Design a protein with these regions (language model features):
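N-terminal membrane-targeting segments
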Residues: 1-28
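Short extracytoplasmic
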Residues: 29-58
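Short helix-to-loop capping/linker segments positioned immediately adjacent to catalytic or ligand/cofactor-binding
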Residues: 42-49, 68-69, 110-114, 124-126
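Short, positionally conserved secondary-structure boundary motifs
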Residues: 48-89
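Short connector loops at helix/strand junctions that flank enzyme active sites
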Residues: 53-54, 67, 95-97, 120
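Short beta-strand/loop turn elements enriched in aromatics
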Residues: 77-100, 134-136
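Extracytoplasmic/periplasmic soluble domains downstream of a signal peptide or transmembrane helix
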Residues: 98-100, 106-206
Length: 206
């Protein structure tokens, strides 16, 4: 029974999660392609609300591989994180002033942040919401802290080195690799934006 449980945790949960993440990406791309989001359109006075548990963006991290792409969903509930990365609901919107903070599993459920410790200063974290590409740049190696250290996702995140308001990104995952006693944190700042009508950003061509 123990062997079967290990197989389920290590293999089957990841297979199901990979399918779920691919499905979320397909859903987003289909919605964007059919005009639910109009490329290059002027932003609405009231930005569209992120619906709990629903995907709204796709994240790319070249450091993790040319094919690495994960959906970003609203919220960090366990069921949400089985389908992709989760946006901390009390943090800023994508690209906005403040701190856009995102959580993801390091192991199990697709292992989206398995290679998190490999992040280095200058690495690109690229996201799109169907109209705009947002390129963030990592500012330091991953930082280890406790799960209770919620200051790391503040608008000006604690211990990040940032001293004033800006357009920031925080990524969080579990530490150690097969545990959850601590957290690994990566911070980035918004480096560039461009319309999807201009094609993919340089960071995805390097």
């Amino acid at each position: 029974m123990i062997v079967l449980l290990v197989v389920y945790v290590l293999y089957w949960t990841s297979v199901r999660a990979d399918r779920a993440m691919d499905g979320e990406i397909d859903h987003l791309q289909d919605r964007w392609a059919t005009g639910a989001v109009t490329a290059g359109a002027q932003p609405a006075p009231e930005p569209r609300r992120y619906e709990p548990g629903a995907s709204f963006a796709i994240m790319y991290i070249p450091r993790f591989g040319a094919d690495w792409a994960k959906p970003v969903l609203q919220g960090t509930a366990p069921g949400t994180l089985k389908k992709g990365l989760g946006h901390y609901s009390r943090t800023a919107r994508l690209g906005a002033t403040g701190n856009f903070a995102v959580a993801g599993h390091r192991r199990t459920y697709g292992d989206p942040f398995e290679d998190f410790p490999q992040l280095r200063p200058g690495d690109a974290v690229v996201l799109t919401d169907g109209t705009t590409w947002f390129t963030y740049r990592v500012v330091r190696r991953p930082y280890r802290t406790l799960p209770t250290d919620t200051g790391v996702i503040d608008p000006v995140p604690r211990a990040s080195g940032f001293r004033r308001p800006g357009r920031y990104l925080t990524l969080t995952t579990c530490e150690p690799e097969w545990g959850h006693s601590h957290r690994l944190i990566a911070w980035a700042h918004l480096d560039a934006t461009q319309s999807v009508t201009q094609g993919k950003p340089k960071a995805l061509h390097s």
